[in-house]
């Protein structure tokens, strides 16, 4: 049982102003596995004051000092590898291999990349007799989601530290343990007091007062569009800078020259990875009408190989949905797909056979889907695919872009020129050709209702900076 009833503020673990706590549930067992403090506005006030008090000192720290700090974090992060893996498997229900190879590793990648970025990042530039300088924006509020407990926190923290901006972090109350471990790491390596502050709690008690606090100059949020809109509204009252990474309904375009077995394997991975709880999940699979029969046969075969089950059992690829509430949401979308006339091709409502305990969902494929159906337009956040056919490339691109979202897109095929054309045509912030994979120095963020701003690498650092021009500096 993990019980974290204190907040980390100004370099110390202190009692929360509130005596209330939030229970953390293991979604694979439905058991309470710990609790965290349910913070309030007084906790936020203390954290913001601590960050504000150190702001000028941290802003004026040297690049060398900040790089050394990031390098120390990297080494201690590695020392806590097993703790991080165990925490994520317990709180998120991610299979152990996924916790290690994706969750743990992505967090590490962001701290390493922020350090590398500082080697060449230009904080100052001369233009004639003028100086253009980039300065840390100031106290930054970070609000992170439950689906990637280390990735989303690490990428924001690494960028803020590299920029010289102190932070107040509010992690998701559903997966808070990984953030506590990060706080322990920062404490161990000597992150200066006030530079990092952790306030656990819910959106109403912590997220809202953080977004509205007049001394917070930047809000960085990852999560739902609904919550992002609220944060933006609250932050706008005193014109805070806002960076938002929101939802997606990403298209995966399968070209007509593709190997269908290869394409089926690739698209399956993009649907079921992290139990479909991925903002970039490629759940709208667009296939040529001429390849439909062969592709669907291969897709069903790939889905049938996916092992759903105990995240601690060897060979498990897909764990549970995060909560009963989210499980019910996924089920309601499956029901909606059937109701609107999509054909259930694989999976369906309910839990996989033999998995009565835990919030396990059946990986599901809908075919004969129209792009205007609810399941093709709304983010489900579960392992549910919508297969849509197209007759020509222009139609495929039109369907791909017929969405309010624009976070990611995928294309698989053989002809390089066609692949590049499709990649350039999809209206989204991140496109992947032939399963190219993640690259931590590439910018990440969305078009349209998928967000504002960019994260990862030097682009992420830019979000935590203000730009100042000084005319006559060199005259």
Curated annotation (Swiss-Prot):
GO MF annotations in UniProt: aldehyde dehydrogenase (NAD+) activity
Catalytic activity, reaction form: an aldehyde + NAD(+) + H2O = a carboxylate + NADH + 2 H(+)
Chain positions recorded as NAD(+) binding sites: 201-207
Enzyme Commission number(s): 1.2.1.3
Top class in the EC scheme: oxidoreductase
Keyword Transcription: no
Catalytic residues (UniProt): 245, 279
Keyword Transmembrane helix applies: no
SUPFAM superfamilies: ALDH-like (SSF53720)
Family designation: Belongs to the aldehyde dehydrogenase family.
Protein name: Putative aldehyde dehydrogenase SH0913
UniProt lineage: Bacteria, Bacillati, Bacillota, Bacilli, Bacillales
């Amino acid at each position: 049982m993990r019980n974290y009833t204190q907040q980390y503020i100004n370099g110390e673990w202190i009692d929360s102003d509130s005596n209330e706590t939030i229970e953390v549930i293991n979604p694979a067992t439905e058991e309470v596995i710990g609790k965290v403090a349910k913070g309030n506005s007084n906790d936020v006030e203390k954290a913001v004051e601590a960050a504000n008090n150190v702001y000028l000192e941290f802003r004026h720290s040297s690049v060398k000092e900040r790089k050394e700090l990031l390098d120390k974090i990297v080494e201690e992060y590695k020392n806590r590898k097993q703790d991080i893996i165990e925490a994520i498997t317990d709180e998120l229900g991610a299979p152990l291999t996924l916790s290690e190879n994706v969750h743990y590793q992505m967090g590490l990648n962001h701290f390493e990349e922020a350090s590398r970025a500082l080697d060449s990042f230009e904080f100052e530039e001369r233009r004639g007799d003028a100086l253009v300088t980039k300065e840390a924006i100031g106290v930054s509020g970070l609000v992170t989601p439950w689906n990637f407990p280390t990735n989303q926190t690490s990428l924001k923290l690494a960028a803020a530290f590299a920029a010289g901006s102190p932070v107040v972090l509010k992690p998701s109350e559903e997966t808070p343990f990984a953030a506590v471990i990060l706080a322990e790491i920062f404490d161990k390596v000597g992150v200066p007091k006030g530079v990092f502050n952790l306030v656990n709690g819910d959106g109403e008690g912590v997220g809202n007062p953080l977004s509205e606090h007049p001394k917070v100059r930047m809000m960085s949020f990852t999560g739902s569009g609904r919550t992002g809109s609220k944060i933006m509204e609250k932050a706008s009252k005193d014109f805070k800078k806002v960076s938002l990474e929101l939802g997606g309904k990403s298209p995966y375009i399968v070209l007509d020259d593709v190997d269908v077995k290869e394409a089926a394997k690739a698209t399956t991975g993009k649907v079921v990875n992290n139990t479909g709880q991925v903002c970039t999940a490629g759940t709208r699979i667009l296939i040529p009408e001429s390849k439909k029969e062969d592709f669907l046969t291969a897709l069903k075969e790939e889905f049938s190989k996916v092992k759903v089950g105990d995240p601690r059992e060897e060979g498990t690829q897909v764990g549970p949905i995060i909560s009963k509430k989210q499980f019910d949401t996924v089920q309601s979308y499956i029901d909606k797909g059937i109701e609107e006339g999509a054909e259930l091709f694989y999976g369906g409502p309910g839990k996989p056979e033999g998995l009565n305990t835990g919030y396990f969902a059946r990986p599901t494929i809908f075919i004969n889907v129209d792009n205007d159906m609810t399941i093709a337009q709304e983010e489900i956040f579960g392992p549910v695919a919508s297969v849509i056919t197209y007759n020509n490339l222009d139609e495929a691109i039109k369907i791909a872009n017929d969405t309010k979202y624009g976070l990611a897109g995928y294309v698989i095929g053989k002809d390089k020129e066609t692949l590049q054309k499709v990649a350039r045509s999809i209206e989204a912030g991140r496109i992947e050709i032939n399963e190219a994979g993640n690259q931590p120095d590439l910018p990440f963020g969305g078009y349209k209702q998928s967000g504002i701003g960019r994260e990862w690498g030097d682009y992420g650092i830019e979000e935590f900076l203000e730009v100042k021009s000084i005319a006559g500096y060199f005259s």
